[in-house]
Amino acid sequence: LAVPFAHPRDRLDPAFRQMVDDIYALMTRRAVPDPKAHAAHPAPTIATPLPPIGTNLMSGLLETLAAPPYNGHADLPAVASALQMELDDLLPLGEALQLLHLAVLEEGDIRLTEAGRTFADGDTDTRKEQFAQALRAHVPLVAQIRQVLDERWNHRASAVRFRDELEDHMSPEYAAQTLRTAISWGRYAELFSYDEEAEQFSLEDIE
């Protein structure tokens, strides 16, 4: 992709901004659901890698998008500039929100869903409840961890069993990262507790 602008580049130049928009659109197009190609975009499974995105970062972006001047729909380059984020950081964040059905990426833009608006407008308890619902519905790994805990008489489960299952589908490094993200997200939503030293999930201290 040729960039016909000499250094230093004027970021306010309309032609330059248009090119940035076009690049963002190309990079996010793959994330846009195509009704005619449903088979090419299968639903998430337990083997779906989860990015190392924290809930504070997701909350911050949702709040930013819900507030003026965006009011739920924003141009990705504008958001990246406002938050002083690089594209490589913003896209995984947007994709995490899309996985949770809290936002949608479309042709270089990001748009809040109704669930995303509810989260952004809610208090702490509402947000945790909304996040828990999203995890149960759209992140099979977290849903499976909670299901196993619910079904066991002592409501405990070793992280090893889930890590081993993930390693059937991805590298040990990706499996470890995916499990860390699942733990972080599940804890925030108060779906389970996790003992780091024992590497064990439980329902202790969960209301």
Q: Whereabouts are the PLM-identified features?
A:
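Juxtadomain coupling helices with adjacent low-complexity linkers
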Residues: M27-P33
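C-terminal coupling/interaction segments
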Residues: Y24, A37-H38
